[in-house]
């Protein structure tokens, strides 16, 4: 997972530790809630910073599964399980941020479950978006809503104009101009 902050304030590739820590801690808390919702007590995850990217200010993040789980999976012949768990959590995170951004603080007016699929259609008036059931359950957690706002808090700093969180398939991008859509 790659997290990139951009803007004129980052031309020297530096960001205040307090700002970065607050944002990453909020992201880690959301990952914890997603993990607990998806896997209950079967695994534990945490974010780790692996590399810093040149250019704007980028951080490569890895969701680390618990060692116990990894050893159990290897011994039981399921070495790809930890990777699949991480992918499920990252996908859930990206859907949560996309839903929060789409809502723009508007109240949900209707929710339809899509038969034979693990998805819901969320309505605000006539507008709609389809999200994964798990992402919607995690999104409803009040702490996740607060953490979404904290995650985008670097956009409150003058000169930081955007942040982007992505995996190999999906990208979530938020600009400073539109940051209020992720506020509580």
Predicted regions and their residues:
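Charged, alpha-helical interface segments at or near domain boundaries
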Residues: 1-184
